[in-house]
């Protein structure tokens, strides 16, 4: 009999007997899918795929911590201990290389390696090196949300690409606030990475190198351009009085205030503001992520969740069959409708109900095609925290100093010469 595979702290004798029966030879294997917190959509998909499996397997879910960094820590620790109870994992893209490099992930079967019809940003974030090591589930990107009345008053043609300079000038001239993310958190790394990438640069040059050989390129013209945007917004208070602690939710609240104007944020804000019956909804519009240069397309952020299978699971074949079911386009479309998380499959965006519920759906899909991942390296955690520590508070960012000092600090951390 397989060893007990459950996360509940207390089990009754009856439940133990039931689980033992499930894992016995006569019953289907019970797959544990470790999920990030949502509004119940992953649990519903698990139930649907269990029913569709026809007795081949049963999927149960186990809830991971709310913060992505805590999810990473828990999964990495358990996989390092060769925990066989981890069958399927919902993985935040930046932490995938850290799981793949030491062999914690089961190889993706050939039949699931076909990425035709998947948005490019999700494909890029599912890779480690040249290999697809996870399967895209849902994908996320940031749009530029704005008040139509403000854009009109500022004389901005929002049918044309808009730049950060134009947004900053509009906020300065009309005494308005910009919804950005200045908190000492992952959201700050997301913002800086998008600015550097949109300027044509990259934070990390050689992501597959060992930690002591990694080369950063923050100390560059593109890094200084990114710092200039952050500095202008931070030093002039354009991000509002709460900018040092402003995460995505704070930016949304600021946007709904009297001096709200423009905001970069994930699509969750649309359903959140609609659910709150916000007065802003009548004046709300959206477009692609701001450009650094009017002639160069932006590189929007990409996030979401990819699915991996634990290398120590005794049920890897069944787990991959379950993954194939979970990521079906119709399930992704339903998940967008119930939980507000956009699909990675282009086909899902053709769903009529989805199109009606999310009028910006096509823009999200197109943005995901242009999106650039954060540095794909097993040492992402060190890079992200190091960047946050050196670019916060944003009011203190100096375009001539911060990129270089940040690069030096992170490099010393990676080489073991300095502690975070």
Identify what each model region corresponds to.
Residues 76-78, 85-87, 115-149, 296-299, ...:
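A structural signal for short loop-to-beta-strand junctions that line the ligand-binding cleft
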Residues 133-137, 142, 165-219, 231, ...:
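Extracytoplasmic/periplasmic solute-binding protein
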Residues 2-4, 11, 15-95, 278, ...:
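Conserved N-terminal structural module of periplasmic/extracytoplasmic solute-binding proteins
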Residues 152, 366-420:
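Conserved C-terminal helix/tail region of periplasmic/extracytoplasmic solute-binding proteins
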Residues 287-288, 336-386:
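Long, aromatic- and glycine/proline-rich binding clefts that accommodate carbohydrate-like moieties
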Residues 171-172, 211-244, 289:
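Glycine-centered hinge/linker elements that transmit conformational signals in sensory
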Residues 93-141, 198, 285-286, 356-357:
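Hinge/lid segment of periplasmic solute-binding proteins
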Residues 152, 232-238, 274-339:
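Extracytoplasmic/periplasmic substrate-recognition and gating elements
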């Amino acid at each position: 009999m397989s060893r007990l595979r459950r996360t509940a702290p207390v089990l009754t004798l009856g439940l133990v007997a039931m689980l033992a029966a499930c894992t016995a030879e006569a019953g289907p294997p019970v797959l544990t899918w470790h999920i990030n917190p949502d509004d119940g959509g992953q649990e519903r998909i698990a139930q649907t795929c269990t029913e569709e499996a026809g007795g081949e397997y049963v999927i149960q879910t186990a809830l991971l911590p709310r913060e992505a960094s805590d999810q990473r820590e828990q999964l990495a620790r358990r996989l390092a201990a060769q925990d066989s109870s981890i069958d399927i994992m919902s993985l935040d893209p930046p932490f995938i290389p850290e799981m793949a490099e030491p062999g914690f992930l089961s190889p993706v079967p050939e039949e699931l390696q076909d990425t035709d019809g998947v948005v490019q940003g999700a494909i890029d974030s599912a890779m480690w090196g040249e290999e697809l090591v996870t399967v895209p589930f849902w994908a996320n990107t940031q749009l530029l949300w704005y008040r139509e009345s403000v854009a009109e008053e500022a004389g901005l043609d929002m049918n044309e690409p808009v730049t950060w300079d134009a947004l900053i000038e509009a906020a300065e001239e009309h005494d308005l606030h910009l919804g950005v993310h200045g908190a000492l958190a992952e959201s700050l790394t997301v913002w800086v990475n998008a600015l550097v990438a949109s300027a044509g640069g990259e934070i990390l040059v050689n992501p597959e190198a060992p930690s002591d050989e990694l080369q950063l390129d923050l100390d560059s013209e593109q890094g200084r351009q990114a710092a200039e945007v952050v500095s202008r917004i931070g030093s002039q208070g354009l991000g509002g009085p709460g900018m040092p602690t402003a995460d995505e939710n704070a930016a949304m609240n600021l946007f709904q205030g009297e001096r709200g104007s423009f905001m970069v944020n994930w699509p969750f804000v649309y359903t959140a503001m609609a659910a709150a019956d916000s007065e802003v909804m009548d004046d709300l519009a959206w477009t692609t992520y701001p450009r650094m240069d009017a002639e160069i397309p932006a590189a929007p952020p990409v996030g979401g969740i990819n699915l991996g299978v634990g290398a120590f699971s005794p049920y890897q074949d069944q787990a991959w069959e379950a993954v194939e079911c979970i990521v079906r386009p119709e399930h992704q479309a339903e998940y967008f409708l119930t939980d507000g998380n956009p699909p990675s499959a282009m086909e899902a965006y053709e769903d009529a109900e989805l199109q009606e519920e999310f009028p910006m759906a096509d823009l999200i899909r197109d943005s995901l095609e242009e999106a650039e991942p954060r540095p794909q390296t097993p040492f992402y955690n060190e890079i992200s925290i190091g960047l946050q520590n050196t670019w916060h508070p944003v009011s203190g960012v100096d375009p001539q100093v911060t990129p270089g000092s940040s690069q030096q600090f992170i490099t010393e951390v990676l080489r073991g010469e300095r502690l975070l």
